[in-house]
Amino acid sequence: TLISLEEDFNPEDFDIVMFGGGQDYEQTVVAKDLQNKKDALIQYIEDNGVVVAICGGFQLLGRYYVNASGERLNGISAIDVCTNGQFPNRLIGDVEIVNEEFGETYLGYENHIGRTYLGKNMKPLGKVVKGFGNNEEDHVEGCHYKNVFCSYFHGPILVRNQHLADRIIETAAERQRSKNA
C-alpha cells in the first residue's frame, strides 16, 4: 500500500513501513506533509512497528535535516538524529558495517551529502568497517531504534543482506502474531 501526499497514515494498516528518500525539492514537499502523519507514525514506532528508512527517510524520521541550500526542514523526531547538509563533497562508495547486537555484517552502497549524527541514546545499525557511514567522524552507519532500521545503504540493502531482510520480516510477523494472540 502506498501513502501519497495528503493521505492519512493508519498504523493498523501496515506490517512494515518502507520510507525512501529523494532529492532536496522532493524532501521539502514530503517533510511538510509528514508533519500531518507525525503522531500516527510515532505511535506506530513506539508500538514496535517495523520501519525500514533509507537516506531521506532516515533523515526525516529525525529531528531535522538541513538541505544543500541551507534550509532547515523539520523531521518528526521519532528518532533522535539530526542531519546537516552544507558540505562540498558527497560520501559515495561501497560500505561495510558490523552490527554487534546481531553479530552480522551488512554490505551496501552509499551516496549522500548529508551528515547525520545520532543522539546519545541512539544505537547505530552498525560500526563502519569500510566506507563513510553517517558522517566522516564517528564511524557508525544508520540507526537502530526499537524495530526501526535506518541506513544510507542505497544499494539495495535488503537484497544484499538477506539475514537483515529475514530479521525484518520475522520481526513484523512476530509483531502480527502477538497482536492476534
Where are these regions (language model features)?
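Short, acidic Gly/Pro/Ser/Thr-rich loop/turn segments
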Residues: D24-E26, Q86, R115-L118, P156-R160
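Structural motif
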Residues: I16-G20, V52, Y152
